[in-house]
UniProtKB/Swiss-Prot annotation:
Highest rank taxon of the organism: Eukaryota
Source species taxonomy: Eukaryota, Metazoa, Chordata, Craniata, Vertebrata
Annotated spans, Interaction with NOXO1: 424-563
Subunit structure comment from the entry: NOX1, NOXA1, NOXO1, RAC1 and CYBA forms a functional multimeric complex supporting ROS production. Interacts with NOXO1. Interacts (via FAD-binding FR-type domain) with ARHGEF7 (via PH domain). Interacts with NOXA1.
PTM notes: Phosphorylation at Thr-457 mediated by PKC/PRKBC positively regulates its interaction with NOXA1 and enzyme activity.
Residues reported to bind FAD: 365-371
Residue stretches spanning the membrane: 37-59, 73-97, 131-151, 196-216, 235-255, 424-444
Designated name of the protein: NADPH oxidase 1
Domain Ferric oxidoreductase: 82-316
Cofactor: FAD
GO MF annotation: an example: superoxide-generating NADPH oxidase activity
A Pfam family hit: Ferric_reduct
Sugar attachment sites: 189, 269
One of the record's GO cellular component terms: cell projection
Length: 591
């Protein structure tokens, strides 16, 4: 039954679908590379830098004469700990950049006239942020395990009574330099736990690791979607992580032989005669050691400066007065806020962060703008999807006077800004995910009213997938206005829209079938009839590719990950390797 209903032109009309040929894997991969080569190049460069830094540091600590005696105690674990530490510094430097929203918006604006491929990496900022976080976790595990081995070997060397080189090195001290030691465990009775929690490196390492674990676990999609407040507050532990990282190396636990000592007693000449180091008649003296200077702060200083400037700018913009001009409660528990703010300027598809101090002083939530740039106000539609949004809707439903104060930060750019750069645009919204396309469709309505000849887009396909009929209500007026405007201008072919209801039952379908001959849809009142089920995307993409054989088609989605995966595959499958023929470019809203 569902297979008969999906993608049907009428509510219960059976359609015959021709069997589809299996996709060509080489063609699909080729199309993917054509669309994402710059993102791939950036990702490969980042991975390559991680590999280079790890190998460089590993070989340095594994082969350098400076750490010859340190390796006598610690072995290869020394090189593993230091190599992973260098990569941790590098990735900790990188992780803040993708979340500097104002910097990314500036870069997007600067690249507005660039090729769409050059802008695409900016659209994956959060994906890159997550990848860097995963890399930090991997190197943290390597670093911790290596140092656990190191501390255990320090302890064993200190307790050893066999007269080996490691035991002699562990008991070394210099009468003129109190810090000229090599083994941080200074007493045979000192435990590994005591040494770890009483040293700067050990204590800051434990605190930074706990902060990292809490941030990563609270960022899981289930928690982020259902307990956003927990994710939001816990993620601010990055401040603790950064501070601990910056001072982690102050203790100088990892020590190497000083340059002066290397000149006097080179390990290649003196390591085999360590029993004669204290013999004044011999040529070898016992070596002197110094701690490795802290370097983490050098890596993170620049991104911290960027981020501090970002937060100052956010704070300044959030303090500007916001005037709420209209509040509308739509069906399906959707709140519309229309607002004004001095100096506010937006583009289609952008989003803002909203804060309501009476609910939470610290929580900022992102919402796509549903107004058009041509309107005198900016608006958002907010669906109850968590404690904060439910409290906000409840606050405005109570109709207190004066209205609660709202703070706004933004707007910030997204992939939807590029919609008018394509000859053909395919807009796909799921549920409240239709909001960025409200802005686009409103802007089109204004452009047609003003006879804007600069509009590059020649055709728009709009798909909206909803679970319940009430969700269509707030959008009906806009679609109805667009229908009338297109009809009056003789451009009915410009917009092709399809509404899909997934939460239907037999009563709704039967009622729709009985009234199928009506001029307007019984659910929405629009001329375009509502379809039941989900779109058959292969049919839709094949139809679009046939209708526009030489066009660049931008596919824009605001919806769940499963739908994104499906559409991304279709874009790759139905694009031609010949740049002169149809090309589908997939774009997904992420903020």
């Amino acid at each position: 039954m569902a297979g008969e209903l999906r993608g049907s032109r009428g509510p219960l009309q059976r359609i015959q679908i021709a069997p589809r040929e299996a996709p060509n894997l080489h063609l699909t991969m080729g199309n993917w590379l054509v669309n994402h080569w710059l993102s791939v190049l950036f990702l490969v460069s980042w991975l390559g830098l991680n590999i280079f830094l790890f190998v460089y540091a590993f070989l340095n600590y594994e082969k350098s004469d400076k750490y010859y005696y340190t390796r006598e105690i610690l072995g290869t674990a020394l090189a593993l700990a230091r190599a992973s530490a260098l990569c941790l510094n590098f990735n900790s430097m990188m992780i803040l950049i993708p979340v500097c929203r104002n910097l990314l918006s500036f870069l997007r604006g600067t690249c507005s006239f660039c090729n769409r491929t050059l802008r695409k990496p900016l659209d994956h900022n959060l994906t890159f942020h997550k990848l860097v976080a995963y890399m930090i976790c991997i190197f943290t595990v390597i670093h911790i395990i290596a140092h656990l081995f190191n501390f255990e070997r320090y302890r064993r060397s200190q307790q050893a009574m066999d007269g080996s080189l490691a035991s002699v090195l562990s008991s070394l001290s210099h009468p003129e330099k109190e810090d000229s030691w090599l083994n941080p465990i200074q007493s045979p009775n000192m435990t590994v736990m005591y040494a770890a929690f009483t040293s700067i490196a050990g204590l800051t390492g434990v605190i930074a690791t706990v902060a990292l674990v809490l941030m990563v676990t609270s960022a899981m999609e289930f928690i982020r979607r259902n307990y956003f407040e927990l994710f939001w507050y816990t993620h601010h532990l990055f401040i603790v992580y950064i501070i601990c990282l910056g001072i982690h190396g102050l203790g100088g636990i990892v020590r190497g032989q000083t340059e002066e000592s290397l000149g006097e007693s080179h390990p290649h000449n003196c390591s085999h005669s360590f029993h004669e180091w204290d013999d004044h008649k011999g040529s070898c003296r016992h070596p002197h050691f110094a701690g490795h200077p802290p370097e983490s702060w050098k890596w993170i200083l620049a991104p911290i400066a960027f981020y501090i400037f970002e937060r100052i700018l956010r704070f300044y913009r959030s303090q500007q007065k916001v005037v709420i001009t209209k509040v509308v409660m739509h069906p399906s528990n959707v709140l519309e806020l229309q607002m004004r703010k001095r100096g506010f300027s937006m583009e289609v598809g952008q989003y803002i962060f909203v804060n309501c101090p009476s609910i939470s002083f610290l929580e900022w939530h992102p919402f796509t703008l549903t107004s058009a740039p041509e309107e005198e106000f900016f608006s958002v539609h907010i669906r109850a999807a968590g404690d904060w949004t439910r409290n906000l809707i409840r606050t405005f439903e109570q109709q207190h006077s004066p209205m609660p104060r709202i703070e706004v930060d933004g707007p910030f750019g997204t992939v939807s800004e590029d919609v008018f750069q394509y000859e053909v645009a395919v807009l796909v919204g799921a549920g409240i995910g239709v909001t960025p396309f409200a802005s686009i469709l409103k802007s089109i309505w204004y452009k047609f009213q003003r006879a804007d000849n600069k509009l590059k887009t020649q055709k728009i396909y709009f798909y909206w997938i909803c679970r319940e009929t009430g969700a269509f209500a707030w959008f009906n007026n806009l679609l109805n206005s667009l229908e009338q405007e297109m009809e009056e201008l003789g451009k009915m072919d410009f917009l092709n829209y399809r509404l899909f209801l997934t939460g239907w039952d037999s009563n709704i379908a039967g009622h729709a079938a009985l009234n199928f001959d009506r001029a307007t849809d019984i659910l929405t009142g629009l001329k375009q009839k509502t379809s039941f089920g989900r779109p058959m995307w292969d049919n839709e993409f094949s139809r679009i590719a046939t209708a526009h054989p030489k066009s660049a088609v931008g596919v824009f989605l605001c919806g769940p990950r499963t739908l994104a995966k499906s559409l991304r595959k279709r874009c790759q499958r139905y694009s031609s390797l010949d740049p002169r023929k149809v090309q589908f470019y997939f774009n997904k809203e992420t903020f």
